[in-house]
Swiss-Prot record:
Keywords (A to Z) from UniProt: DNA-binding, Transcription, Transcription regulation
Organism from which the protein derives: Bacillus subtilis (strain 168)
Family per record: Belongs to the LysR transcriptional regulatory family.
Encoding gene (name): yraN
Gene3D superfamilies: 3.40.190.290, Winged helix-like DNA-binding domain superfamily/Winged helix DNA-binding domain
DNA-binding region, residues: 18-37
GO molecular function list: DNA-binding transcription factor activity; transcription cis-regulatory region binding
Protein name: Uncharacterized HTH-type transcriptional regulator YraN
Keyword Transcription regulation: yes
Xref: InterPro entries: LysR_subst-bd, Tscrpt_reg_HTH_LysR, WH-like_DNA-bd_sf, WH_DNA-bd_sf
Length: 289
């Protein structure tokens, strides 16, 4: 078995489907099946059993997957160590970043960091903050940038702090909200709770949900076309949107805030590249209150 086989087993275990594994590896299903049969022949085992939808790994298959994960981690650790021996900052930086931060902030940051350290390559995985948290816990990424609060055993530092706003095409008042169409969007549990709690406290009746869309950016476009109002964090608002915005306050009269957190393992600071990136982020002074 080599690195390609380790990756194959790891992804197959994640997907529990030969078809989806082939799609992720950009190869054909027959070639995946052929390689899996070769692995089974080498060890004289069955890796998995087929079921109506997908597959189920055997005990022997689970053992080989665990071995593949260990070998991939050892290989990555070796690559990191060798890169770290160089006097210059170089190597492969593995980042897990929440979708919103990745869309609105990350490109500019990576461009600036790449200008400072041109010999750095990036592996960036984006998604819900809960998914990024799983990547951190599994050691798949070295640095996580997450929205909202999460349990983390390592270092956790606030990177940004922003206000939440009501957004609409034209000026509106809080008293009008129960009678206006509300555009809801899918988001992580922490932001969803903040918004729902505020509405429960400040609106005399439940909002009229006109539609529910998949992303904040889609929601914002609907609002820009006058189809309703919504509540959004400052990170996604631009002057060019030409939207009416109203800050939200809690019962104590303080602005409702949305935090973005920088998370990493303390041991990762021993890697020049990771330390350089973390120091760079801290030097950006992105925290706003």
């Amino acid at each position: 078995m080599d690195e390609k086989d380790w990756i194959l087993l790891k992804i197959l275990h994640e997907e529990q489907s030969v078809t989806k594994t082939a799609e992720r590896l950009f190869t054909s299903q027959p070639s995946i099946t052929y390689r899996l049969k070769k692995i089974e022949e080498i060890f004289g085992i069955e890796l998995f059993t087929k079921r109506h939808k997908g597959i189920t790994f055997t005990a022997e298959g689970e053992h080989l997957v665990a071995y593949a994960r260990r070998m991939l981690q050892e290989l990555q650790d070796t690559k990191d160590h060798i890169s770290n021996l160089s006097k210059e900052v170089q190597g492969h930086l593995r980042l897990g970043v929440s979708s919103n931060f990745a869309q609105y902030k990350l490109p500019k940051l990576l461009r600036e960091f790449s200008t400072m350290y041109p010999n750095v390559q990036y592996s960036v995985q984006t998604g819900w903050s809960t998914d990024v948290m799983k990547l951190l816990d599994a050691g798949i990424v070295q640095v996580g940038i997450l929205r909202g609060s999460h349990r983390w055993k390592g270092v956790e530092e606030r990177l940004t702090r922003e206000k939440l706003h009501i957004i609409s095409k034209k000026p509106i008042t809080i008293e009008q909200l129960p009678f206006l169409p509300f555009i809801k969007y899918k988001t992580d549990a922490s932001l969803k709770t903040i918004i729902e709690d505020w509405m429960h406290t400040n609106l005399k009746q439940a909002p009229i949900i006109a539609m529910e869309v998949d992303r904040q950016e889609t929601c914002k476009e609907m609002v820009k076309h006058g189809l309703g109002y919504s509540i959004a964090p400052e990170i996604c608002l631009q002057e060019s949107d030409h939207l009416y915005t109203m800050e939200l306050y809690n019962a104590k009269g303080k602005p409702l805030m949305r935090d973005t957190w920088l998370m990493y393992d303390q041991k990762s600071l021993g890697i020049k590249l990771v330390k350089a990136f973390i120091d760079f982020l801290k030097g950006e002074q992105m925290v706003t209150i």
